[in-house]
């Protein structure tokens, strides 16, 4: 606390582990129910939604809400948030896919929610099967772990565990046709039998209702959703209850559905009243007023996530794209060529690019069909 640093950094965590390597294990006795959230996209938002819903029910919760999700970040969050004189009802820990198993070496676990698995940061994780194996290694260390899984993602649905609960989308309705933009970026997966999976419905990427001629198919979700998308929010109908979500995009509707499913499993009350008051974490569909102007901040870091964000862009707005390649961002920015920045070729105003890899972004926009005169990569 004397450093003045927050739970959003990892510096305190590094100091704490040097002073006491068993710190994480010692935290177990101060928390009643321990929840982890992992997956490629949506971890921070989903974990934030769960924490918000728990707090709205009158229960106490600790979390790493600022998104520091590796081992030192988790230790950091717990060290500045836990009260050693009063037990906390819940911990909600967003966990990096590669660090989940390391966290589970020292930290107990009751629930794990897995959002999705997409190709992401190939320089860190390699292929998707590597990411899946890292998560499965963590699951295997906790035989009593309750899994809350996205049934619409064939990789997520195939995780092995003794206690699995599924959530999924039945239908998606668009209040505005501009929100329904199609993309060609899709992931193709094979059934365990080796044949390509087929789909009766596909919502985005590999998310949908899949099946194989061998009989393998999407598991039946306990929590089934009908999603209605609007320009500034969405409505999710889950088992005859309507939940208003103050977030844009189908990807955020999936995040909210996962949070609702997990909180239902916990027996959390007042979800319908609490959900509309949710405030997002920095950079995740965050709305700010800068110099009096309405500003929407989105995070993109892989093709699938970028495409879903690009679908929501108002083409009449001023656009700034910042691309970095620090370790946490992923060194490999070749994913820019797999994301469909063609969505931006008919924007009204100039597009400003910035960050360490601004030139790469400018080149990508050029090949996406954005007029050269509209691409601004020097704002000095």
Predicted regions span which residues?
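Cys/His-rich short segments
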Residues: 169-235, 246
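Acidic-glycine-rich active-site phosphate/pyrophosphate-binding loop
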Residues: 44-52, 226-240
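Gly/charged, well-structured mid-domain segments that form the phosphate/adenylate-handling core
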Residues: 228-231, 262-300
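Active-site beta-alpha connecting loops in nucleotide-dependent enzymes
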Residues: 281, 299-377
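Buried hydrophobic packing segments
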Residues: 50, 54, 74-78, 256-266, ...
């Amino acid at each position: 606390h004397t450093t003045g640093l927050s739970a959003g950094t990892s510096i305190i965590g590094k100091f704490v582990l040097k002073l006491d390597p068993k710190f994480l294990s010692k935290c177990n006795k101060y928390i009643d129910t321990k929840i982890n959230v992992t997956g490629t996209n949506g971890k921070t938002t989903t974990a934030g939604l769960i924490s918000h819903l728990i707090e709205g029910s009158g229960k106490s919760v600790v979390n790493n809400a600022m998104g520091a999700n590796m081992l030192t970040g988790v230790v950091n969050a717990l060290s500045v948030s836990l009260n050693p004189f009063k037990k906390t009802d819940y911990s909600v820990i967003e966990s990096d896919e590669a660090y989940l198993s390391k966290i589970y070496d020292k930290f107990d676990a009751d629930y794990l929610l897995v959002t999705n698995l997409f190709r992401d940061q190939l320089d860190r994780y390699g292929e998707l099967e590597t990411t899946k194996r890292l998560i499965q290694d963590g699951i295997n260390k906790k035989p009593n772990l309750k899994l809350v899984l996205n049934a619409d993602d064939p990789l997520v649905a195939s995780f092995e565990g003794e206690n699995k609960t599924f959530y999924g989308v039945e239908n998606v309705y668009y209040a505005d046709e501009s929100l329904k933009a199609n993309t060609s970026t899709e992931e193709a997966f094979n059934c365990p039998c080796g044949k390509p999976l087929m789909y009766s419905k596909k919502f985005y990427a590999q998310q949908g209702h899949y099946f194989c001629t061998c009989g393998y198919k999407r598991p039946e979700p306990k929590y089934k959703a009908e999603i209605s998308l609007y320009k500034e929010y969405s409505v999710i109908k889950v088992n005859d209850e309507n939940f208003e979500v103050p977030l844009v995009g189908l990807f955020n509707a999936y995040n909210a559905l996962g949070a609702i499913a997990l909180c239902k499993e916990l027996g959390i009350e007042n979800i319908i009243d609490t959900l509309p008051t949710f405030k997002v974490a920095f950079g995740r569909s965050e709305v700010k007023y800068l110099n009096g102007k309405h500003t929407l901040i989105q995070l993109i870091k892989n093709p699938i996530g970028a495409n879903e964000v690009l679908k929501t862009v108002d083409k009449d707005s001023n656009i700034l794209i910042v691309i970095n390649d620090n370790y946490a961002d992923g060194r490999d920015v070749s994913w820019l060529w797999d994301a469909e920045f063609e969505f931006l070729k008919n924007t009204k105003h100039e597009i400003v690019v910035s960050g360490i890899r601004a030139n790469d972004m400018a080149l990508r926009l050029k090949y996406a069909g954005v007029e050269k005169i509209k691409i601004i990569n020097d704002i000095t």
